[in-house]
Each structure stands twice: as structure tokens, then as C-alpha cells.
């Protein structure tokens, strides 16, 4: 897999191994140095050394060899199925449930569960680690997720994701009381330059990201909101709400305030998903039941 980067003037004179370490968050600096030694990283079509300092307009091509993965096995893990036919499966993903395997984490994921449930009826466009997976939600975010059962459906849904035509509505509880009852956050999101596993508002290397929000209910110190996505960037709602000083309750990455409640990650639920069905070519929409912990917060805990 190749990645191409053009160096911005603001980032010149940084060592290339550090520069790429900030951009390729899934890989260590040591691994990047290994790629450099093996001539898998070229600057302006030429090999380089790890201590090379990048210059404005440098074209950097990073060729990451395909890793060798362990076998991914089907596992009999219960699924909360919202809808299923020959083309798609809609599941309500619970908290603390990783969508797909990754190096060092090959079991106990949604992929293991759908491989058991669907047998061989899954798209294979995304390879052995992500059969059937056309999009994903964070480990501690609950709610509706589309699984594609064949390659045609996968491509059909992917096109709608690219066109931003899929309806994706979330509900979430944020810190503080919002002054505006509805609004739009339009701010590009990219990798944090220092904290590699985090995202941030990034005007230089970020990708376009748009979130609509609407207040559903206000509490003394919190607000229940509905969010609708135009784009689907990693951690989009979490980053956007933190950027306006209303991070999600329980978010252990973007909310730096101590949570007074025992929560397992952010209070965020993918409530609604709608799309043009690959077979019928008609619009369909599905809702994922709100988890009990979320309902308890709204009805009994928050005042």
C-alpha cells in the first residue's frame, strides 16, 4: 500500500522519520526507520536517510508492505440484529466491542461474530481483516452498523458513503449547556501532530468534516444532542464537540474533565442509518435501540 505526501512549508526542516511518524499513526518511528533503510520511502523519487529534513513541496512516497496476519476465526458471539437480507446485515453494536481485528487483537471482534453468523456470505473487498465491513464506529460508541454480504452490495454502499448521501444520526450527551439549540460545525479533521492516536482540528493536513447538531434536552450540567454527519471522519463528533468546549460525557480522550459517573467511554450512540438498498434501489432506514446505560442516564441520573 502506497501513501503520498506533499510537505507543507510550515512543516519543513523536520526529520523525515518524525514527520512520517506524526502522519502514519498506526506505525512506530522504529518501523518507519526500517522502511527507510529498505528503500520503501522515497523523497522526490530518490531514497533518503532517517535524518533527512523535509523541505517544502517535497514529494514523499511511502510503500508499506502488506503484513502477514494470523488466521481470523469465526466466533459464536451474540449479535443484536436489526435487519438482515441477502445483501446487507444491520447490527446494533454494543459498547467495548471492536469492529475488526488488528495485529495482536485477532478475536472477540464484530468481524469474528459476523463470520460465524454469515458463514461465507460476506464481501471480501476489504481483505481478510475486514470481511463485510464497509464503515465502522468506535469501540465504545454503540449503535447501527452496516455489514455487506456480497461485493456488489459493498461497492453500492461505498459509493453512497463517498457521495455523503447516507443518513447517519447519532445521539450523545455532552459536557455543559449549549447556548445554541442547533448549529453546524464545519472544521477539517486530521491526525494530531504529537499524540498519534488522537485526531484534532487540522487546518493544514485535515480532511473536510461537517457535523450538524441539535439540542434534544438540557440538564443542569449536560446536554442531550442529536448529531447528523455529512462526512464520516475518525472521531468526528467527538473532536468537533470538544472543539467548541462541549466534549462528550465519558470521553476519555477528548474530555479532560473528570466524569462523575461510572461510564465505559463516550456517551454516543449511532441511532439511525439510512441508505438506498443495493437490491431494491429504494431508500431504507433503520434505528438502533438506545442502550440501557444511556437511557438510565437520561431518565434517572442527570438532573
Regions found by a protein language model. Give the residues of each.
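Pseudouridine synthases involved in rRNA/tRNA modification
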Residues: 1-31, 79, 194, 203-210, ...
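Short flexible coil/turn linkers enriched for glycine and charged/polar residues
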Residues: 85, 139-140, 166, 207, ...
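Short, well-ordered beta-strand segments enriched in hydrophobic/aromatic residues
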Residues: 89, 225-228
Amino acid at each position: 500500500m502506497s501513501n503520498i505526501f506533499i510537505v507543507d512549508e510550515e512543516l519543513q526542516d523536520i526529520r523525515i522519520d518524525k514527520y512520517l511518524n506524526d502522519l502514519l499513526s498506526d506505525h512506530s518511528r522504529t518501523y518507519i526507520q526500517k522502511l527507510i533503510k529498505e528503500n520503501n520511502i522515497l523523497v522526490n523519487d530518490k531514497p533518503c536517510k532517517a535524518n533527512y529534513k523535509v523541505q517544502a513541496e517535497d514529494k514523499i512516497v511511502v510503500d508499506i508492505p502488506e503484513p502477514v496476519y494470523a488466521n481470523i476465526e469465526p466466533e459464536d458471539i451474540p449479535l443484536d440484529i436489526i435487519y438482515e437480507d441477502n445483501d446487507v446485515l444491520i447490527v446494533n453494536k454494543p459498547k467495548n466491542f471492536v469492529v475488526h481485528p488488528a495485529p495482536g487483537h485477532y478475536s472477540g471482534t464484530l468481524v469474528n461474530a459476523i463470520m460465524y453468523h454469515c458463514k461465507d456470505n460476506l464481501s471480501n473487498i476489504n481483505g481478510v481483516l475486514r470481511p463485510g465491513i464497509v464503515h465502522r464506529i468506535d469501540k465504545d460508541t454503540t449503535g447501527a452498523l452496516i455489514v455487506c454480504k456480497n461485493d456488489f452490495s459493498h461497492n453500492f454502499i461505498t459509493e453512497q458513503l463517498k457521495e455523503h448521501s447516507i443518513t447517519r444520526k447519532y445521539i450523545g450527551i455532552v459536557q455543559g449547556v449549549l447556548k445554541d439549540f442547533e448549529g453546524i460545525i464545519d472544521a477539517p479533521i486530521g491526525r494530531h501532530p504529537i499524540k498519534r492516536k488522537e485526531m484534532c482540528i487540522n487546518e493544514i493536513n485535515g480532511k473536510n468534516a461537517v457535523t450538524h447538531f441539535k439540542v434534544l434536552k438540557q440538564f443542569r450540567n449536560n446536554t442531550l444532542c442529536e448529531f447528523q454527519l455529512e462526512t464520516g471522519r475518525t472521531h468526528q463528533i467527538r473532536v468537533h464537540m470538544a472543539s467548541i468546549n462541549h466534549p462528550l460525557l465519558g470521553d476519555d480522550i477528548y474530555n479532560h474533565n473528570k466524569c462523575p459517573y461510572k461510564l465505559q467511554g463516550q456517551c454516543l450512540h449511532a441511532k439511525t442509518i439510512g441508505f438506498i438498498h443495493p437490491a431494491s434501489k429504494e431508500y431504507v432506514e433503520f434505528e438502533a435501540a438506545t442502550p440501557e446505560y444511556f437511557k438510565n442516564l437520561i431518565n434517572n441520573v442527570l438532573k
